[in-house]
Amino acid sequence: MNKYNFGKIYKIYSVSANLYYYGSTIQSIPMRMTTHMRDYRRYKNKGLAPRCSSYKVLDCPDWKVELVEEYCAETKYDLEKREGEFQKNNVCVNKNIAGNGKRKIKT
């Protein structure tokens, strides 16, 4: 088994604002959210340009995170490709579609 066999697709969302962000990880969801929140706090506290489109959702007071799917991938590319399917097929704030080789901007 490799670490990508334990892949997860998750969404961060705000129902009141109708905003959704899709991501993937091999970490636990709480551990991944720790990183999202650390980066978000740096963005807010230092007035930096947003690095991640999840910040739009994290700005909402009612945001939540949810496991969408456990995904047994062979490689990072496989996991990102699956993440990209959710990004393409759902309304979301993600600017980049994962798993396209080169970063593709969502239109």
PLM segments and residue spans:
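Structure-specific nucleic-acid interaction/processing domains
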Residues: M1-T107
